[in-house]
């Protein structure tokens, strides 16, 4: 009880000090949760793109964000390249297209062709929490976030793509039977709906501009190809071989994509570090100031304690404990409020969310606040502990 009594001798100063740590931990928690979510996406991307080669139309600059189309027949040519184990054509369309009034800070919902080869050859594998895999047209597997957003379970019917409020008269939707729900991955598949290649090609045809719809056969097209190598094959070398042997395509080396993902992760790690430093500067200096003032105001008390036998260690422990308590209170309150902020903002971030509060972040935030309080109290504690009791008693009339 004496600890709390000492803290509240100067209520305003203690409150401001706790507020300083509180603000720093709120920043650390929210920015850290943002970074944790982004890093989970990075980890999934590194695993997926590091285990396969992405191939796209050469004229559009390759597969990663090129936006072009390639002939489906290219899959057969790619499969004949020495070292290739399997080829999966890919098509992805928006699940909620065209609504300009929709604002989302998370990953967008999408519809994509299933990749049956991915489970056998790919490094990134998904699992089902219920149901089975897509086997025929008219069926769909839903990512965990998308299933929650649309409130769907196995056996339900889902209409995709979702018709926006500003849809044109020729906007087309299709009904699918939900046959499987994917286990949460904390990465891109969570916001996806996965259908057969034929159904994805149908959706691609629906999304084409009216001017070219009649002149293009979507069932002969793919947006990209995912190429899986045989065991032991160097994928970067295989990408070079594809570029040399197959015309009109551009194979991107897995190492290029992996490095781009890691670079993005480094940026968010830096953001978290800045938030931690902010907490250190604001909280640490405020604790040091408060404890130094406490020592100055309690000179006579310290002198009396030492005069009646209190040892240096007792005084040192008392002041370090007080500063640690300040850090703990500010840390707990800051983490709780930061967590609430992630819940509120996360609700407007689309089905994929925006924040991820992990056990690691919880330990980091609370541990940082407690250690900060303890370390910041060391200097004032030493000053108090080394005080001469005779001088201390004389300093106050």
Predicted segment positions?
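N-terminal Sec/SRP start-transfer signal
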Residues: 1-27, 39, 44, 397
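N-terminal membrane-entry
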Residues: 30, 262-279
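Juxtamembrane alpha-helical signal-transduction segment immediately C-terminal to a transmembrane helix
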Residues: 34, 38, 42-45, 264, ...
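Hydrophobic secondary-structure segments that place a key small or acidic residue at a functional site
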Residues: 91, 109-114, 126-207
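Transmembrane alpha-helical interface segments in multi-pass membrane proteins
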Residues: 16-19, 23, 272, 279-288, ...
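Hydrophobic, regular-secondary-structure patches
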Residues: 26-110, 130-136, 240-244, 248-250
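Mechanotransmission and gating elements of multispan inner-membrane complexes involved in transport
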Residues: 170-177, 181-270
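C-terminal membrane-exit region of the final transmembrane helix in multipass inner-membrane proteins
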Residues: 2-3, 10, 361, 365-397
